[in-house]
Amino acid sequence: MKNFINSISRFINGLKRPSKKTNIKKLHERGEILDSFTFRDATEEDTPELGKLHAIAWAETYNAKTPNIQLRQYQWQKAFTEENDGLWFCILVVNAKNKLVGFAKGKINKDEHTSQLHGDLNKIYLLSDYQRLGLGKKLFTLAVQRFLSKGINDMSLFGVPQNPSCAFHEAMGGERLYSEKGTFDGCYRWDDLKKLAVH
């Protein structure tokens, strides 16, 4: 029953997202072209805009009121100042006007028993007007390549089962992980990142 309810929630949330045709039209109306977008690592100076992007993209994803932008900015500021251990990264999607329109945050986790490193795709978001244009696929691939560059060949994503982006995760080869009770809680696993690096 829980899986069914979550699937309905994903479907409803997904209905409110713009179609590919709509977003291509909006892209042209803004005078943008796909080749004009760049991808780069986030820096501490990006904190104000990154926090704003995070808050808005989260609200769009779950059809919720925009969370406190200042809270998100604080969280990112804390990440840059207190978690500067080299065990995480954030890749940004930037348009020609230098506006942030998407990001992916990855974390490197170390197994306490084997000392083996594992990838955690902690967050991946695009503003709704920039979805279904291939930018998310490129962003995902860059995150995969970053993990591979660290010698990591597997990755997990611990999301929310109501997230309509579950379809995207599965399109990118994510395998659903189920709880002992058989419920899907939004978690995915990729066991061979080398196969994904060429997407």
Give the positions of each predicted feature.
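Acetyl-CoA-dependent GNAT
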Residues: 25-28, 32, 41-47, 52-127, ...
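Conserved hydrophobic beta-strand within the GNAT/NAT acetyltransferase core sheet
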Residues: 121-124, 155-159
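Conserved acetyl-CoA-binding loop of GNAT-fold acetyltransferases
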Residues: 170-179
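Acyl-donor-binding surface of acyltransferase catalytic domains
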Residues: 1-33
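Conserved beta-strand-loop-alpha-helix junction that forms the acyl-donor binding cleft
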Residues: 131, 156-166, 182-185
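Glycine-rich phosphate-binding loop
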Residues: 134
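Conserved active-site tyrosine of GNAT-family acetyltransferases
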Residues: 54, 168-170
